[in-house]
């Protein structure tokens, strides 16, 4: 059985080779007219410039954390693994974003020349590069680190590296994209009355750049962190559960998931008459079926039974069901979004109130599903089962990220088609692809939250084991634990306040700039004057880089401060409090934002007066409120709860040594 561990790095390399093949495949496609190429170049250069500037700042942060880990816990091997995790997360995000900004224009060109099927294939292939890089780098890194060290504690350093990059990528990307989006919508749509993706809008390029840095690179880093974190927790608990076999099993399951994701990619095929959504679902479901069957076989081989496989299947099924539930609350095909659209007829206030209500209601079923998953997994395999459920949920990350990253590529393709003045038939195709992309993006956010909850819980169990909380448990009547719980419960709200305020400040600057250009550049609204796109890109870039630091530093320092001052028990309370409120708040914000977005699109399809109506203006306001909800604060909370837990796990020896100052 021990030899099976080598499947992990081998399948990781296979995933990276498949990503390379898809990159070449996308690159060979026609990039369209000169105007299309010009617009795509603006988007590509803007995205690359932002990531380069962001990574320069992250180099300093990573270097400081490297020294703190080495000195703080006295283990430089863990510190080196931290560097590797940060490097791999950075590489996955950069490669995925780079290919996405090439796939967008080729998707638009395919829609123009070949129709729906070819456009879907290119957009999905571009997204699949991100997916394969996430699982490729994650599985290869985790596999090699464990093979070389056989030490789960060292492996937590690799996970912390992934988490550190993920937080800044998600927060920075989210602030960037939503500053541009809010500015473009409020001044362009509401004040000037021009359509979305209109080339007359100075913020339109920054908005399309934001799709890539936020929803491709940021989302990929988020799920890379969850993927690695689930493996770390499963390996840590697996050593206790079944020694070497317990540690190897999750790595082999992850390798199986990579194979299943590659197989699933070949099932994503559509035609001119079928729904692209069905094609994407076929790919995801086929990958899930392969993992279910394979996990039963592997469980029998490793443990001579099926209990461990059932824990994995619990996680996998819960992940799929959370995606379905998210679609019901955020898709225009269902009553919740239609209700918000109807409320828009009476103005922005009722639009916002209705969206908040839908978001709050949408927390119930996912939380119940997560609870059922935890109970089921624990019933069959104990605490190890909870970690396996997280591995199971994330086993098909390759195709999950591919489907999620497809969305912003399709959105960009529609923007390029609009700005290039392509015929309405082309925009009809890209609109269909984009509509599906909005739904898959919302489902992806739901999946990311569910996986973050299980991963954080599994890492929390690993932390409890590391500091010896299993023997005595956490005493909820201990004043230190209660203080920790209150502080932990508050942190997701404070974190969200920071990120929402950051978007507000950046959007204010963007709105002022767009208004200035409309007033001072002659003929801009008539299409005769040329907007200054670069100034808007610069505003988003500078704001995102400046504003991402405070939330990021808070996420790292809060658990260290509580652990040092109040001790390991209080820190356990903090992690538990943050997990409970963080998951609820993330679901609420992500689903409210998604519902507002699709209510606006539902009206734009001709309902309740269509584009330009009073209902549409109200829906645009709701969508604008929802933008930082669903693309900045909501997704970033996922990383907050995981990062605080992995920081606690890495620095557990230090907290035990100090034992608290009070």
Q: Where is each model-derived feature located?
A:
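Hydrophobic packing and interface segments
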Residues: 1-662
């Amino acid at each position: 059985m021990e030899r099976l561990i080598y499947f992990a790095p081998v399948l990781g390399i296979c995933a990276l080779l498949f990503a390379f093949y898809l990159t070449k495949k996308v690159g060979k496609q026609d990039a369209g007219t000169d105007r299309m190429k010009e617009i795509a170049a603006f988007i590509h250069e803007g995205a690359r410039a932002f990531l380069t500037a962001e990574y320069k700042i992250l180099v300093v942060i990573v270097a400081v954390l490297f020294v703190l880990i080495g000195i703080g816990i006295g283990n430089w091997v863990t510190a080196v693994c931290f560097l590797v995790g940060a490097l791999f997360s950075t590489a996955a995000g950069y490669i995925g974003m780079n290919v996405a900004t090439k796939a967008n224009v080729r998707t638009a060109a395919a829609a123009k020349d070949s129709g729906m099927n070819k456009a879907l294939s290119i957009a999905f292939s571009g997204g699949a590069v991100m997916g394969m890089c996430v699982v490729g780098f994650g599985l290869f890194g985790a596999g090699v680190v464990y093979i070389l060290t056989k030490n789960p504690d060292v492996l937590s350093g690799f996970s912390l590296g992934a988490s550190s990059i993920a937080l800044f990528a998600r927060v920075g990307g989210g602030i960037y994209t939503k500053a541009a989006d809010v500015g473009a919508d409020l001044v362009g749509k509401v004040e000037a009355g021009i359509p979305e993706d209109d080339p007359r809008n100075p913020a339109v390029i920054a908005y399309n750049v934001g799709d890539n840095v936020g929803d491709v690179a940021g989302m990929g880093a988020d799920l890379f962190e969850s993927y690695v974190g689930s493996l770390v927790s499963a390996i840590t608990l697996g050593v206790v559960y079944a020694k070497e076999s317990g540690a190897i099993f999750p790595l082999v399951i992850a390798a199986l998931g990579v194979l299943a994701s590659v197989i699933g990619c070949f099932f994503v095929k559509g035609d001119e008459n079928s729904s692209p959504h069905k094609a994407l679902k076929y790919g995801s479901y086929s990958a899930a079926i392969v993992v279910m069957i394979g996990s039963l076989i592997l469980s029998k081989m490793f443990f001579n039974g099926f209990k461990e496989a059932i824990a994995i299947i619990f996680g996998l099924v819960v992940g799929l069901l959370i995606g379905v539930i998210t679609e019901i609350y955020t898709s225009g095909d269902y009553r919740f979004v239609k209700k918000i659209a109807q409320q828009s007829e009476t103005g922005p206030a009722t639009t916002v109130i209705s969206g908040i209500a839908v978001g709050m209601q949408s927390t119930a079923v996912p939380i119940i599903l997560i609870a059922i998953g935890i109970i089921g997994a624990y019933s069959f395999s104990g605490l190890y089962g909870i970690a396996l459920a997280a591995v199971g949920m994330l086993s098909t990350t390759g195709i999950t990220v591919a489907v999620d990253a497809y969305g912003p590529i399709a959105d960009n393709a529609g923007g390029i088609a609009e700005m290039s003045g392509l015929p309405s038939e082309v925009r009809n195709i890209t609109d269909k692809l984009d509509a599906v992309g909005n739904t898959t993006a919302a489902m992806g956010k739901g999946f990311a939250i569910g996986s973050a909850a299980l991963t954080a819980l599994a890492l929390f169990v690993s932390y409890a084991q590391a500091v010896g909380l299993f023997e005595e448990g956490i005493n909820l009547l201990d004043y230190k634990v209660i203080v920790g719980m209150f502080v932990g419960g508050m942190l997701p709200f404070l974190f969200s306040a920071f990120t929402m305020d950051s978007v507000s400040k950046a959007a204010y600057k963007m709105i002022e700039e767009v208004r200035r250009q409309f007033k001072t550049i002659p003929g801009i609204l008539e299409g005769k004057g040329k907007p200054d796109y670069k100034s808007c890109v610069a505003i988003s870039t500078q704001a995102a880089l400046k504003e991402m630091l405070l939330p990021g530093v808070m996420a790292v320092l809060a658990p260290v401060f509580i652990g040092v001052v109040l001790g390991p028990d209080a820190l356990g309370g903090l992690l538990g409090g943050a997990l409970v409120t963080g998951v609820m708040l993330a679901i609420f914000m992500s689903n409210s934002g998604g519902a507002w977005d699709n209510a606006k699109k539902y009206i734009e399809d001709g309902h309740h007066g269509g584009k330009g109506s009073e209902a549409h203006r109200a829906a645009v306001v709701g969508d604008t409120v929802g933008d930082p909800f669903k693309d900045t604060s909501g997704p970033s909370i996922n990383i907050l709860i995981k990062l605080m837990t992995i920081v606690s796990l890495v620095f557990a020896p230090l907290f035990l040594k100090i034992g608290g100052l009070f």
